[in-house]
Amino acid sequence: MPRYGFHLSIAGKKGVAGAVEEATALGLTAFQIFAKSPRSWRPRALSPAEVEAFRALREASGGLPAVIHASYLVNLGAEGELWEKSVASLADDLEKAALLGVEYVVVHPGSGRPERVKEGALKALRLAGVRSRPVLLVENTAGGGEKVGARFEELAWLVADTPLQVCLDTCHAYAAGYDVAEDPLGVLDALDRAVGLERVPVVHLNDSVGGLGSRVDHHAHLLQGKIGEGLKRVFLDPRLKDRVFILETPRGPEEDAWNLRVLRAWLEEA
């Protein structure tokens, strides 16, 4: 059965531990967080008490799968100081994931040269001393400009002969020209041929405000965007039955209730 959840906040006194509490309260079976502010280079220290509380709460919840999303400032395709800062920031997220016992770290490749993206991702793994866990996932992008990773073939090159794996974002794929609305299984087939679905442990299950091939990275709530029911076929595809599905849409009691109602209705239909 797929595991599912939201991107949760770590703001407040409880920090990362508060995210586990919220996930449990909402009945989620997975969750995603930032390890620090997504719009600051400043690292965020984790106290031993915060780490202990996070680990204990996850264990008590049955070990909810967790994902850390790297900072939005990271651009592994850049040059010079920006590239160095991006690699250091990603390494910091990987170190925190290892400390917390988090399984996955997701990063946007950025803009520039694919060779720099691959080099930067591998350097971050080395700096963090990561061997097998956490797994670093490169997320597909909506494309436009010099953004790296909009095409599945480019993702395949980025992860080839490395420990890197892939995070599929359905909104980004649709915006990049993959018709998740009308041919979701064909899109998964294309990803399988290029990368191998066994190397896609996490899916960002987002609907899309923008149209097919629009290059617009604007997420919508389930069934409230241009993809619609195509997302159900992705969510329930047997090839993805044990994957982690994360929704990255604006949070609120009504919005959460809607998205959970849709996901749980889909599971009942399966």
Swiss-Prot record:
InterPro entries: AP_endonuc_2, AP_endonuc_F2_Zn_BS, Xyl_isomerase-like_sf, Xyl_isomerase-like_TIM-brl. The keyword DNA repair applies. The keyword Hydrolase applies. Its cofactor is Zn(2+). Zn(2+) 3 binds at residues 172, 217, 219. It catalyses: Endonucleolytic cleavage to 5'-phosphooligonucleotide end-products. It is an enzyme of class 3 (hydrolase). One of its GO terms (biological process) is base-excision repair. Binds 3 Zn(2+) ions. Zn(2+) 1 binds at residues 69, 108, 139. Zn(2+) 2 binds at residues 139, 169, 204, 248. Keywords: DNA damage, DNA repair, Endonuclease, Hydrolase, Metal-binding, Nuclease, Zinc. SMART domains: AP2Ec (SM00518). Its EC number is 3.1.21.2. GO terms for molecular function: deoxyribonuclease IV (phage-T4-induced) activity; DNA binding; DNA-(apurinic or apyrimidinic site) endonuclease activity; phosphoric diester hydrolase activity; zinc ion binding. Belongs to the AP endonuclease 2 family. PANTHER family: APURINIC-APYRIMIDINIC ENDONUCLEASE (PTHR21445:SF0), ENDONUCLEASE IV ENDODEOXYRIBONUCLEASE IV (PTHR21445). Endonuclease IV plays a role in DNA repair. It cleaves phosphodiester bonds at apurinic or apyrimidinic (AP) sites, generating a 3'-hydroxyl group and a 5'-terminal sugar phosphate. In addition, possesses a 3'-5' exonuclease activity. This is Endonuclease 4. It comes from Thermus thermophilus (strain ATCC BAA-163 / DSM 7039 / HB27). The lineage of its organism: Bacteria, Thermotogati, Deinococcota, Deinococci, Thermales.
